[in-house]
């Protein structure tokens, strides 16, 4: 039991840093989904596309 507590105390950074990275990637993906839903509803991007023109925001 003491050895487990010592390991946790010494190596907590090795767990929290990757966990923060994964949570950040998840939040970034959710933010991109919300922005994609809003993409062509704003006045800035709401216009007709020219022939052979790609979407305004990917």
UniProtKB/Swiss-Prot annotation:
One of its GO terms (cellular component) is respiratory chain complex I. The keyword Calcium does not apply. The keyword Transmembrane applies. Keywords: Electron transport, Membrane, Mitochondrion, Mitochondrion inner membrane, Respiratory chain, Transmembrane, Transmembrane helix, Transport. It is found in: Mitochondrion inner membrane. It comes from the Eukaryota. The chain crosses the membrane at residues 11-27. Belongs to the complex I NDUFB1 subunit family. This is NADH dehydrogenase [ubiquinone] 1 beta subcomplex subunit 1. It comes from Pongo abelii (Sumatran orangutan). The gene is NDUFB1.
């Amino acid at each position: 039991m003491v050895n487990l507590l010592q390991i946790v105390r010494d190596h907590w950074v090795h767990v929290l840093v990757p966990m923060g990275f994964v949570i950040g990637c998840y939040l970034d993906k959710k933010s991109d989904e919300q922005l994609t839903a809003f993409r062509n509803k704003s006045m800035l991007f709401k216009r007709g596309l020219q022939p052979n023109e790609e979407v305004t925001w990917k």
